[in-house]
């Protein structure tokens, strides 16, 4: 018991040390008034494996109407088209004006939860919303604030902001409403402004995109479900095999038991009895014979005695014979 406690304590210490290696990125408030969403580009982040990011659904304010959003993890082509019609992956829904709550993303390569998010280094991942900030437009699957206000997050996992310039992911021309947000430099996890090192912009197709990451995410889940299904099938087959084997063994045991019962003698031998007279034969034996199954039973039996040679008896009993017949030989 003491050893188990020490092991649990060691595991807890290791977990805290591993958790301390990552850092908490600056939370992102999902609101149209957030100046971090740059017009035509969105918000670019450079998280590392082990980091955490909180997306905040703010509490409603009486001075302005509450904004309703449904956030999705999307592929690059979905982000460019501002469309979540095909294969939507919902992360969080901001639809409770009475309270503020957070959705935490932990950037980890392997998730202990089979429905958890998994990330790979040097790949891009995308978050956006196609809602239009109203309750009626919460379920919109096209356009929305992704198109009008560039409310999207580009997460470049394990990448250096000074080595790779952020791509200009312009989907469509933003509306005039979005122009009043102003253009502010995007800050990475090192709290430094993202600068263009002077390299020419390259095509998005030449770089790792979130499509592979999201596809890998779904493929890993499919593999887990397939493995679970295969294990269940194998387990069921083993159970069926054991049940069939048990039934066969029980049938065989019953068959042997019936054969042994049928092989029992139909008569009972009495003890040999010696006569008190001196002139009587020493091999006098009284044998009671009784039929058990049928009224007519031809029977051949060998009887051994302690006072002479073996005696063989052949009997044929008609149906009207009494139950017990005694022969003196």
From Swiss-Prot:
PROSITE patterns: EPHRIN_RBD_1 (PS01299), EPHRIN_RBD_2 (PS51551). A motif (PDZ-binding) lies at residues 327-329. Inducible phosphorylation of tyrosine residues in the cytoplasmic domain. Tyrosine phosphorylation inhibits TLE4-binding. Disulfide bonds join 57-94, 82-146. Expressed at low levels in most tissues with highest levels in the kidney, oocytes, ovary and testis. The keyword Glycoprotein applies. Residues 1-20 form the signal peptide. Residues 23-157 form the Ephrin RBD domain. Residues 21-226 are extracellular. Residues 248-329 are cytoplasmic. Keywords: Developmental protein, Differentiation, Disulfide bond, Glycoprotein, Membrane, Neurogenesis, Phosphoprotein, Signal, Transmembrane, Transmembrane helix. The chain crosses the membrane at residues 227-247. It is a single-pass type I membrane protein. One of its GO terms (biological process) is ephrin receptor signaling pathway. Glycans are attached at residues 132, 203. GO terms for molecular function: ephrin receptor binding. It is found in: Membrane. Residues 163-192 are annotated as: Disordered. InterPro entries: Cupredoxin, Ephrin, Ephrin-B_Ecto, Ephrin_CS, Ephrin_RBD. GO terms for cellular component: glutamatergic synapse; plasma membrane; presynaptic membrane. Belongs to the ephrin family. The PDZ-binding motif is required for TLE4-binding. Interacts with TLE4 through the PDZ-binding motif. Cell surface transmembrane ligand for Eph receptors, a family of receptor tyrosine kinases which are crucial for migration, repulsion and adhesion during neuronal, vascular and epithelial development. Binds promiscuously Eph receptors residing on adjacent cells, leading to contact-dependent bidirectional signaling into neighboring cells. The signaling pathway downstream of the receptor is referred to as forward signaling while the signaling pathway downstream of the ephrin ligand is referred to as reverse signaling. May have a role in the developing mesenchymal and nervous tissue. This is Ephrin-B1. It comes from Xenopus laevis.
């Amino acid at each position: 018991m003491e050893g188990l406690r020490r092991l649990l304590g060691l595991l807890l210490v290791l977990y805290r040390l591993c958790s301390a290696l990552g850092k908490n990125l600056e939370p992102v408030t999902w609101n149209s008034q957030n100046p971090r969403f740059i017009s035509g580009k969105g918000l670019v982040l450079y998280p590392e494996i082990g980091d955490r990011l909180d997306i905040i659904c703010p509490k409603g304010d009486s001075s302005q109407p509450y904004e309703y959003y449904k956030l999705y993890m999307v592929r690059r082509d979905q982000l460019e088209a501002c469309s979540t019609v095909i294969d939507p992956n919902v992360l969080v829904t901001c639809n409770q004006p009475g309270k503020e709550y957070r959705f935490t993303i932990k950037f980890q390569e392997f998730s202990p939860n089979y429905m958890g998010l998994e990330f790979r280094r040097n790949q891009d991942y995308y978050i956006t919303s196609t809602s239009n900030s109203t309750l009626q437009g919460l379920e919109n699957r096209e356009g929305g604030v992704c198109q009008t206000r560039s409310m999207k997050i580009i997460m470049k996992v394990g990448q250096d902001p000074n080595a790779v310039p952020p791509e200009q992911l312009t989907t469509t021309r933003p509306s005039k409403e979005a122009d009043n947000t102003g253009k502010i430099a995007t800050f990475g996890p090192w709290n430094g402004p993202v600068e263009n090192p002077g390299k020419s912009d390259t095509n998005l197709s030449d770089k790792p995109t979130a499509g592979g990451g999201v596809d890998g995410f779904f493929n890993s889940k499919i593999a887990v479900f397939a493995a679970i299904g295969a294990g269940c099938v194998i387990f069921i087959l083993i159970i069926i095999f054991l049940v069939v084997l048990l039934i066969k063994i029980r049938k065989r045991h019953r068959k042997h038991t019936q054969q042994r019962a049928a092989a029992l003698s139909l008569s009972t031998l009495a003890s040999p009895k010696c006569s008190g007279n001196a002139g009587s034969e020493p091999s006098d034996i009284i044998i009671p014979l009784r039929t058990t199954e049928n009224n007519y039973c031809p029977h051949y039996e060998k009887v051994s005695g302690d006072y002479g040679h073996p005696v063989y008896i052949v009997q044929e009993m008609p149906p009207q014979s009494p139950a017990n017949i005694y022969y003196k030989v």
